[in-house]
């Protein structure tokens, strides 16, 4: 096995001071996301979503953030997927935005709520047609024999939907994650990182600096 214990670097790209922390965490998230979007980070909206199964076993996967506002964070998925099955059983999830190349990360805990069909359809119709077709092809998280099976099914569905709009699959939808806590981490020199956690208190937020 490779020796990896010596892999490390200093975090020197910034600090997060008390006076720079706004009362609303979504304002800080928006400001950080703008910085990330202006950088050369690929997939700036990629986030890890963690769910747990009925035995308490956690699972993680990368999805794309598609919208955020004062209500929370939105993503879309196959409703027959493992993550959707987990959420149906336990709607408590966590999200992580791993912006490590800029020494930043944002960790969110919250409750995942299904989006309305109207919201889902609006987003689905904005997707490239090939992505819409792909939504019909994959029975997400189920075993398949080979990639060729997917490619054959895609070709079949592409021919089927060659004319007109691609309909929204009944098994495709999305979630709004309403945050209960949002933690911002800014890497610091000598491992003296800056951490601030926001906690939802009824309709307002409280924030606290945490030791690294």
Curated annotation (Swiss-Prot):
InterPro entries: Pyridox_Oxase, Pyridox_Oxase_CS, Pyridox_Oxase_N, Pyridoxamine_oxidase_dimer_C, Split_barrel_FMN-bd. It comes from the Bacteria. Catalyzes the oxidation of either pyridoxine 5'-phosphate (PNP) or pyridoxamine 5'-phosphate (PMP) into pyridoxal 5'-phosphate (PLP). Substrate binds at residues 8-11, 66, 123, 127, 131, 191-193. SUPFAM superfamilies: FMN-binding split barrel. This is Pyridoxine/pyridoxamine 5'-phosphate oxidase. The keyword Flavoprotein applies. Belongs to the pyridoxamine 5'-phosphate oxidase family. NCBIfam families: pdxH, PRK05679.1. Pathway: Cofactor metabolism; pyridoxal 5'-phosphate salvage; pyridoxal 5'-phosphate from pyridoxamine 5'-phosphate: step 1/1; Cofactor metabolism; pyridoxal 5'-phosphate salvage; pyridoxal 5'-phosphate from pyridoxine 5'-phosphate: step 1/1. Homodimer.
């Amino acid at each position: 096995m490779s020796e990896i214990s010596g892999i490390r670097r200093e975090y020197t790209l910034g600090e997060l001071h008390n006076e720079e922390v706004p009362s609303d965490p979504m304002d800080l998230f928006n400001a950080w996301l703008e910085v990330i979007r202006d950088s050369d980070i690929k997939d700036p909206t990629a986030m890890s979503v963690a769910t747990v199964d009925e035995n308490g076993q956690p699972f993680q996967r990368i999805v794309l953030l598609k919208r955020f506002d004062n209500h929370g964070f939105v993503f879309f998925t196959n409703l027959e997927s493992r993550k959707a099955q987990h959420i149906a059983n336990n709607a408590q999830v966590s999200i992580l935005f791993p912006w490590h190349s800029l020494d930043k990360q944002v960790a969110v805990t919250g409750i995942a709520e299904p989006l309305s069909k109207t919201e889902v359809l609006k987003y689905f119709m904005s997707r490239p047609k090939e992505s819409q077709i792909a939504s019909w092809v994959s029975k997400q998280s189920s075993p398949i024999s080979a990639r060729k099976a997917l490619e054959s099914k895609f070709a079949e569905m592409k021919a089927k939907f060659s004319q007109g709009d691609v309909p929204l699959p009944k098994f495709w939808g999305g979630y709004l994650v309403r945050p209960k806590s949002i933690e911002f981490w800014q890497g610091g020199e000598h491992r003296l990182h800056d951490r601030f956690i926001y906690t939802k208190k009824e309709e307002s937020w409280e924030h606290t600096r945490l030791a690294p």
